[in-house]
């Protein structure tokens, strides 16, 4: 009687030959061989069925070996399951960590957005004083000679433009993050 490794070796060789003949039948051209389409189709079907049959035999062989191994050494199966569970836990921990990072970045974006949307009254008192004309050096005149109402309106316009730019930048960042987030 042949040993199991010899049978397995023969089975592997037969599977490889069946695969090669299947590929050969699929790539054969009818004009070059003088064989019509029906004969080629029949050959493809036969070689494919043989390949599938040998693949099932190979699968059955490995299942038998796995069953023998589980019966003779159950501790190996437990070690394998333990290893698989550890890998699964590590993968899920990494996924959770990535979600927490995204949540933190979203929190930061939202808090930044809320800070930029605060009205001018929330500015520090020294900046509010500049906007209302409370600058030392003369009523209504800046040291550079620009009138206070004009200077105030320029500062307000600059601040509004900066706020709009920041809001647009944040909106773009949020869109990019939403596009990079996996669905599901």
UniProtKB/Swiss-Prot annotation:
It is found in: Nucleus. Residues 77-105 form a coiled coil. It holds the Pfam family Med28. Keywords: Activator, Coiled coil, Nucleus, Transcription, Transcription regulation. The keyword Coiled coil applies. InterPro entries: Mediator_Med28 (IPR021640). One of its GO terms (cellular component) is mediator complex. Its main location: nucleus. Component of the Mediator complex. Component of the Mediator complex, a coactivator involved in the regulated transcription of nearly all RNA polymerase II-dependent genes. Mediator functions as a bridge to convey information from gene-specific regulatory proteins to the basal RNA polymerase II transcription machinery. Mediator is recruited to promoters by direct interactions with regulatory proteins and serves as a scaffold for the assembly of a functional preinitiation complex with RNA polymerase II and the general transcription factors. Belongs to the Mediator complex subunit 28 family. This is Mediator of RNA polymerase II transcription subunit 28. It comes from Aedes aegypti (Yellowfever mosquito).
């Amino acid at each position: 009687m042949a040993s199991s490794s010899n049978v397995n070796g023969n089975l592997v060789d037969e599977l490889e030959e069946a695969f090669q003949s299947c590929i050969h039948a699929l790539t054969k051209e009818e004009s070059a061989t003088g064989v019509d389409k029906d004969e080629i189709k029949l050959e493809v079907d036969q070689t494919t069925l043989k390949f599938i049959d040998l693949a099932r035999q190979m699968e059955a062989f490995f299942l038998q070996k796995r069953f023998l191994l589980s019966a003779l050494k159950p501790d190996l199966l437990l070690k394998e399951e333990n290893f698989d569970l550890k890998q699964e836990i590590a993968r899920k921990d990494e996924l959770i960590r990535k979600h927490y990072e995204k949540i933190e970045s979203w929190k930061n974006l939202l808090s930044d957005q809320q800070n930029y949307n605060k009205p001018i009254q929330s500015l520090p008192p020294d900046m509010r004083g500049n906007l209302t004309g409370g600058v030392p050096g003369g009523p209504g005149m800046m040291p550079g000679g620009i009138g206070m109402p004009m200077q105030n309106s320029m500062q307000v316009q600059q601040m509004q433009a900066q706020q709009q730019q920041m809001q647009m930048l944040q909106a773009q960042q949020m869109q990019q993050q939403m596009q990079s987030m996996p669905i599901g």
